[in-house]
Amino acid sequence: MAVLDTDLDHILPSSVLPPFWAKLVVGSVAIVCFARSYDGDFVFDDSEAIVNNKDLQAETPLGDLWHHDFWGSRLSSNTSHKSYRPLTVLTFRINYYLSGGFHPVGFHVVNILLHSGISVLMVDVFSVLFGGLQYTSKGRRLHLAPRASLLAALLFAVHPVHTECVAGVVGRADLLCALFFLLSFLGYCKAFRESNKEGAHSSTFWVLLSIFLGAVAMLCKEQGITVLGLNAVFDILVIGKFNVLEIVQKVLHKDKSLENLGMLRNGGLLFRMTLLTSGGAGMLYVRWRIMGTGPPAFTEVDNPASFADSMLVRAVNYNYYYSLNAWLLLCPWWLCFDWSMGCIPLIKSISDWRVIALAALWFCLIGLICQALCSEDGHKRRILTLGLGFLVIPFLPASNLFFRVGFVVAERVLYLPSVGYCVLLTFGFGALSKHTKKKKLIAAVVLGILFINTLRCVLRSGEWRSEEQLFRSALSVCPLNAKVHYNIGKNLADKGNQTAAIRYYREAVRLNPKYVHAMNNLGNILKERNELQEAEELLSLAVQIQPDFAAAWMNLGIVQNSLKRFEAAEQSYRTAIKHRRKYPDCYYNLGRLYADLNRHVDALNAWRNATVLKPEHSLAWNNMIILLDNTGNLAQAEAVGREALELIPNDHSLMFSLANVLGKSQKYKESEALFLKAIKANPNAASYHGNLAVLYHRWGHLDLAKKHYEISLQLDPTASGTKENYGLLRRKLELMQKKAV
């Protein structure tokens, strides 16, 4: 087994704490770093993965989670992102149930506690990485390298690059994946207890358990499968003591003893490698079958380098992305929620100064790899090898080497690779301490890094508390990112600041002239401001760029309807439905078009389709009731109204519409009850009081009619119909008073 190099651990500028206290300190520090995010909102991707994800609600059968992607879409759909994380979604569903709805505090607290727990687990992981494996006679693993493991765990706990995973609720996928990844690694270590008397049987159990935990990690996030590769590296280079330098020397000298290398004759190692390979192959096969229609389809704006025609351009830019990821680990002050859409322009020429970053990255990596594989110091080899293994292997799924990914740089994918970074940094501090007498200076540097990173975590957690702060924080990092401007515009539009939203949407379109979502949203705002001509031009361009953009087709239809271009509007609605068959809002708007054209049957059919697809679509129900009421079909209007209220019992607008129908049918008592219920739900609706007054007027309850006419006119003094009815009532009351005299 690997043994501890006591010299390295003793000279590190770190305290020695018993395991319990070390874990308590690390866990507490991890909580302090990200506690500020506990009461934050759902931000950015949280909206799609949580708030709009029906898989979290009880109406969706639990079994559907195994057939849906992370965002709630069916995996078999061509539009699915194929991100299969059912166990993560299950935890969201439990959170939703325990919180009694979409209350973000519970979701954020779980994320913070998960990061704290993972940081605590890191103390054990780093103890193995730095100190090796040693067990007591009772089979308990010794806590070796206490200084190194504490320092590395603290560096991990306070790393600001983790903010996206902890403060963004969807980052739970990375947290859960990391948790089971580390448990799998520690479980694999259990297979090599020196006190193991049962030999292969016990070892096989722990190897199989490790593979199972790797599968669980993969069901939290795809990255989890890479733990099998890390376990294999650990087994070969640490347990098997495979020495590349020794092998190379024997090959060069044609040493016949090469044939007798223990690793090559180790049946146990070959058996474990077979298990790991078989387990990994099985997991990949199942994962591929689940994907259904093949890999996801990404666009050029998601990952521009992967669409470059030249293989050289692709390779250069991929390596530049790697250097940016390395820089985020080294200097995590430059953070952004999204790095796509022009944030990182492509390197297209060797004269681009950014190629220096590639050279620096590979200079460092090659140096570390040479030291890791060829150093005569076995302890140094082990630490560097495992540090590089943790740095590189979990990052492979995001590297674009095996398949195209849907992002340029993503801070969340660095959660596990940062373990390797912390190993290398801690080893570097140890090496510096060993070769210099300025121990206090190194200790001050270490404390400075911990303090600055903690401060950055607190500040960055604050930026993740709301979308406005998060999006605006990105402007200084990625001013060329069209998506940053788009998201700021969307946030402003949601708050009603249309003028500012238009400015940001226009900038997003300027930065990316093919940004159809920005065109669609800008077109919608212009439509609401009655700037119909420009709205039509933008929406027409959007559907020209992306012909299957159903939402843009529907919005184009709305604009064309407003311009009285009814045939074009109908065609646009039909095209939208063609590309998105289950589109209740489009059926609703199509029904409005038919109503404007007095095609009443077609309108009713369109609205009925909307309610079939979305039973809670109150606008469609309301329009059906009103149309049937206006055309004199009171019995049918009443039936539709009752059907609607059974599905949406607390919708006051439906109560109001049905109450009007019942009043015309002289069902005064039932109509009154519905009016009063609607008014209780929405007491400031002038029309509710006005129509209830009309009911009382017809019914002969003139004092009550007078009361509600007056309330209605207080709420809306400009309502001409109410004024006229109130005047009629007053004249009637005056006549009655004169007759009484």
Curated annotation (Swiss-Prot):
It is an enzyme of class 2 (transferase). Pfam families: TMTC_DUF1736 (PF08409), TPR_16 (PF13432), TPR_17 (PF13431), TPR_8 (PF13181). It is a multi-pass membrane protein. Residues 1-14, 133-141, 187-198, 246-268, 376-382, 434-440 are cytoplasmic. Its EC number is 2.4.1.109. It catalyses: a di-trans,poly-cis-dolichyl beta-D-mannosyl phosphate + L-seryl-[protein] = 3-O-(alpha-D-mannosyl)-L-seryl-[protein] + a di-trans,poly-cis-dolichyl phosphate + H(+); a di-trans,poly-cis-dolichyl beta-D-mannosyl phosphate + L-threonyl-[protein] = 3-O-(alpha-D-mannosyl)-L-threonyl-[protein] + a di-trans,poly-cis-dolichyl phosphate + H(+). TPR repeats lie at residues 482-515, 516-549, 550-583, 584-617, 618-651, 652-685, 686-719. GO terms for molecular function: ATPase binding; dolichyl-phosphate-mannose-protein mannosyltransferase activity; mannosyltransferase activity. It is found in: Membrane; Endoplasmic reticulum. Keywords: Deafness, Endoplasmic reticulum, Glycoprotein, Membrane, Non-syndromic deafness, Repeat, TPR repeat, Transferase, Transmembrane, Transmembrane helix. GO terms for cellular component: endoplasmic reticulum; membrane. Pathway: Protein modification; protein glycosylation. Residues 36-111, 163-165, 220-224, 289-354, 404-412, 462-741 are extracellular. It comes from the Eukaryota. Its main location: membrane. It is linked to Deafness, autosomal recessive, 122: A form of non-syndromic deafness characterized by adult-onset progressive, sensorineural hearing loss. Sensorineural hearing loss results from damage to the neural receptors of the inner ear, the nerve pathways to the brain, or the area of the brain that receives sound information. Transfers mannosyl residues to the hydroxyl group of serine or threonine residues. The 4 members of the TMTC family are O-mannosyl-transferases dedicated primarily to the cadherin superfamily, each member seems to have a distinct role in decorating the cadherin domains with O-linked mannose glycans at specific regions. Also acts as O-mannosyl-transferase on other proteins such as PDIA3. This is Protein O-mannosyl-transferase TMTC4. It comes from Homo sapiens.
